[in-house]
């Protein structure tokens, strides 16, 4: 697919000549940043609270950010900036190894990161708690899960962890009923084979959950 391109004109803004950085922010509501700094170091310290993503149907206007860094000659009227999402997308696929066994299947994203730096940073924020998303029903109590996966999608601020601290990892909790009993399982999201549990901004991750 072609890369989306937005051509827009900003009036009343003069680009400073010389080497500099032009920062562009999209889909950020008025008032989310109390005061915009006029220097790059101040811009790099800005943190955006994206806790509102915990509720469903609020993921269509996630914040975008990009920047141009280089020489700006006198008379320059246009620069090209590539925008990326401040969040990562989690694609959760839930299915059963054998159809007709599991019912009342629910999932919940837990210990999710809700804040992130606006400018890409080598310093990362740890989850502060309160990052549990609303529990979501995958299939109700009156139906059974089949072998064809059912998908749920989440957006989350990036959670970059060293992997050694399990308390910083984002988890997916799954609840399901089987044979009249309810079972609960929590899975740390990431690459367990290489002990990498980081979920980085502007990336898509797919997790296939198969109930047995």
What is the predicted function of each stretch?
Residues 36-46:
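A surface-exposed, glycine/aromatic-enriched loop/edge motif typical of exported proteins
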Residues 1-38, 89-93, 97-201:
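Tryptophan-paired
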Residues 44-86, 93-97, 190-212:
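Extracellular beta-sheet/turn segments enriched in Thr/Pro/Gly and aliphatic residues
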């Amino acid at each position: 697919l072609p890369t989306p391109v937005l051509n827009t004109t900003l009036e009343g803004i003069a680009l400073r000549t010389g080497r500099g950085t032009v920062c562009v922010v999209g889909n950020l509501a008025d008032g989310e940043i109390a005061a915009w700094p006029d220097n790059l170091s101040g811009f790099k310290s800005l943190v955006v609270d994206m806790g509102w993503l915990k509720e469903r149907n609020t993921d269509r206007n996630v914040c975008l950010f990009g920047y141009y860094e280089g020489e700006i000659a006198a008379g320059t009227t246009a620069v090209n900036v590539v925008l990326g999402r401040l969040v990562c997308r989690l694609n959760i696929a839930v299915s059963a190894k054998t159809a007709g066994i599991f019912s009342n299947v629910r999932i919940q994203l837990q210990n999710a990161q809700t804040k992130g730096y606006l400018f890409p940073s080598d310093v990362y924020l740890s989850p502060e708690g309160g990052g549990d998303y609303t529990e979501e029903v995958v299939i109700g109590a009156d139906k059974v899960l089949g072998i064809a996966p059912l998908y749920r999608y989440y957006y989350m601020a990036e959670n970059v962890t060293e992997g050694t601290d399990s308390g910083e990892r984002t988890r997916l909790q799954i609840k399901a009923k089987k044979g009249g009993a309810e079972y609960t399982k929590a899975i740390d999201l990431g690459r367990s084979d290489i002990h990498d549990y980081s979920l980085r901004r502007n990336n898509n991750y797919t997790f296939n959950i198969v109930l047995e």
